[in-house]
Amino acid sequence: MPIVNAKPDAELFSDLDSTVAWAKSQGGDTSRLGIIGFCRGGRNVLEYAAHNKSLKAAVAFYGFPVDPEAQKALWPKSPIERVPEINAAVLGLYGEADQGIPVSQVEMLKSALKGAGKTFEIKTYPGAPHGFHADYRASYRKEAAEDAWNQATAWFKKYGVLT
């Protein structure tokens, strides 16, 4: 993760904007734009949902809502600080036993989204650790992973990203 964690938010946004532009240039329907990510990618989902106003839906699997203080130079605002800027419908999928993202942070994210009047749903899986969807790791939890994937697919269908 050192290389990924050294990427400034501005560069992340530029890369994702370029990806969207490329998809559009290839005939992709960017009016149905959605984003999904896991772990650091889940954090990126929350950040990009605030950056790209065309995004319809965002699904964050165990995305960090609060950044470590040491990252402030590269990541000036935590996802939770960007909540007022979010336009996309946000689905957050978290493990209750996540050692890196305490339930208290998930609750803070929920409160911020609710307080800002955002369209969102947060689901926390009892006993599931961080990485519960990674079937190549010991943290994999089949039942939670399958339900979370079904939730994500349904979310994208509900908000017009998938048909």
What are the residue ranges of the model-derived segments?
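A conserved short beta-strand
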Residues: S54-P65
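Short beta-strand/loop motif that positions the catalytic acidic residue
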Residues: I86, G92-Y94, D98
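Short beta-strand immediately N-terminal to the catalytic nucleophile in serine-hydrolase-like folds
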Residues: I35-G37, F61, L93
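Conserved alpha/beta-hydrolase "acid-adjacent" motif
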Residues: Q99-Q105
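Gly/Ala-rich beta-loop-alpha elbow adjacent to hydrolase catalytic centers
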Residues: G37-G41, V45
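C-terminal catalytic histidine-bearing segment of alpha/beta-hydrolase fold enzymes
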Residues: K114-T163
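Alpha/beta-hydrolase active-site loop
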Residues: P2-Q26
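Alpha/beta-hydrolase fold nucleophile elbow
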Residues: A23, G27-F38
